[in-house]
């Protein structure tokens, strides 16, 4: 389905992350008299910002109160002129006829001036480079003509300044006239993926050129990356957040949770994992309903902070393993531990191939795997204790005989191994702590399937 046509409800609609109410609140603000432009919809890469943006736009279009424009800044940054990008989209919403022609005629001076300024900057840069190469030969000539050049330069700067102010005023007046009939809301997406110069120029253009009544902007971006773009352009000495604050009036972060009003909120990524697995249907329902597997998926996604895009990557690789193994790697065995170890192999391929490379060399680093799974050390099991270890602790315990680097926090004594064996059988994780190389073999064999070995 075309992402631009996606909706929260209706035929083909979906709201699996329960974000419609977020969109409704954003729309309420955009329609209010509060000056919140530019507003930022913030979120990490892969959290579903673009899909949410299109669903919000389609929801808002139902009331037909605003002219709504969507700009994919990443696709537009090759033009290298944000002003042209925005104006071109505004022109598109005007019907063919006198109104569109009049608007184009009124904004042309500003466009011409912008292009002329860019061209001058390019020529000036080339002249400075040429001059630097032969500067020593022209010292005397420059000294004689310096005063005349300064006078002429000052005159040109003043003329350019007057022309700029005049062109800008004309452009803003034309925009105000258009927006007075139907307010304009411009959604600019993917600003965080643009070249730093284009992203910063877009912010400047929005603030200094499009700050007119009836025209609002919504930036859909990752502000952390936007700050990096600012530092790229102006240096690390610049406080990027304070610089950004000059351009943004209101910001909200797209929640990573799909169920936000519960004591234990559910991560959207966790819900998305089961949605994709269910849609594709390559894992059995009995396996998916296993308590330890569900706990492991939730623990790993939360610990790693996986994005929706990363969930898609993970599910794709699990499906690849199932296809290449004739559905023989993830099956509802008597013991779930083997499937979990194989799942660790898939996760290493997706997110930490560096650890996998070391394992292939024969280096099984307990600290690295523990950090990957969120286990700092194995718990000491008390005699008669009722506290059942967590699922990731079971996985680390099953690998204990394979660890050969940094294993002090994961070593199990003979007495402790008996207790681990008892717990493993109790929860149907595994019959006992495996012999050497047996557990790590599950990881490697699964990873090798994806390497076509």
Question: What label would you give each PLM region?
Answer:
Residues 285-408:
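Helix-rich C-lobe and terminal helical cap/extension of kinase-like folds
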Residues 1-72, 429-453:
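Walker A/P-loop-proximal flanking segment of P-loop NTPase domains
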Residues 46, 75-79, 223-227, 257-261, ...:
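Conserved nucleotide-binding/hydrolysis micro-motifs of P-loop NTPases
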Residues 374-453:
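Charge-biased C-terminal accessory regions appended to nucleic-acid-, cytoskeletal NTPase
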Residues 103-131, 135, 251-331:
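Conserved AAA+ ATPase small/helical "lid" subdomain
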Residues 53-173:
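P-loop NTPase nucleotide-binding core
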Residues 1-11, 15, 23, 59, ...:
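The catalytic "switch" region of P-loop NTPases
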């Amino acid at each position: 389905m075309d992402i631009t046509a996606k909706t929260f409800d209706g035929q083909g609609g979906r709201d699996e992350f329960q974000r419609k109410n977020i969109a409704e609140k954003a729309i309420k603000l955009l329609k209010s008299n509060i000056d919140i432009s530019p507003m930022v919809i913030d979120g990490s890469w892969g959290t579903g910002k673009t899909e949410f943006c299109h669903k919000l736009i389609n929801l808002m279009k139902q009331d037909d109160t605003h002219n709504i424009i969507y700009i994919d800044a990443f696709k537009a940054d090759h033009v290298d002129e944000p002003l042209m990008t925005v104006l071109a989209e505004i022109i598109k919403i005007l019907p063919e006829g006198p109104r569109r022609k009049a608007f184009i005629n009124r904004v042309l001076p500003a466009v011409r001036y912008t292009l002329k300024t860019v061209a001058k900057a390019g020529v000036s840069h080339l002249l400075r480079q040429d001059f630097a190469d032969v500067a020593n030969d022209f010292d005397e000539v420059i000294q004689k003509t310096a005063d005349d050049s300064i006078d002429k330069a000052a005159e040109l700067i003043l003329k350019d300044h007057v022309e700029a102010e005049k062109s800008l005023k004309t452009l803003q007046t034309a925009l105000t006239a258009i927006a007075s009939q139907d307010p304009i809301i411009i959604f600019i997406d993917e600003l965080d993926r643009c070249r730093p110069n284009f992203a910063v120029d877009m912010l400047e253009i929005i603030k200094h050129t499009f700050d007119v009544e009836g025209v609002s902007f919504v930036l859909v971006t990752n502000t952390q990356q936007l700050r990096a773009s600012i530092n790229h352009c102006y240096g690390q000495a610049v406080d990027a957040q304070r610089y950004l604050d000059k351009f943004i009036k209101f910001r909200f972060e797209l929640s990573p949770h799909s169920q936000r009003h519960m004591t234990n909120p559910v991560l959207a990524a966790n819900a998305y994992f089961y949605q994709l697995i269910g849609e594709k249907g390559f894992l059995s329902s009995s396996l998916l309903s296993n308590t330890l597997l569900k706990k492991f998926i939730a623990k790993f996604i939360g610990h790693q902070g996986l994005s929706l895009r990363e969930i898609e990557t993970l599910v794709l690789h699990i499906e690849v393993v199932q296809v290449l193994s004739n559905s023989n790697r993830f099956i509802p065995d008597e013991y779930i531990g083997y499937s979990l170890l194989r799942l660790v192999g898939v996760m290493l391929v997706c997110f930490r191939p560096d650890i996998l490379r070391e394992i292939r060399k024969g280096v099984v680093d307990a600290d690295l795997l523990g950090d990957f799974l969120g286990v700092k050390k194995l718990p000491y099991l008390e005699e008669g204790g009722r506290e059942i270890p967590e699922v990731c602790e079971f996985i680390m315990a099953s690998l204990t005989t394979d660890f050969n680097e940094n294993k002090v926090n994961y070593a199990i004594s003979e007495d402790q191994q008996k207790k681990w064996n008892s717990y493993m059988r109790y929860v149907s994780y595994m019959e006992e702590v495996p012999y050497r190389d047996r557990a790590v073999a599950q990881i490697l064999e699964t990873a090798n399937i994806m390497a076509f070995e």
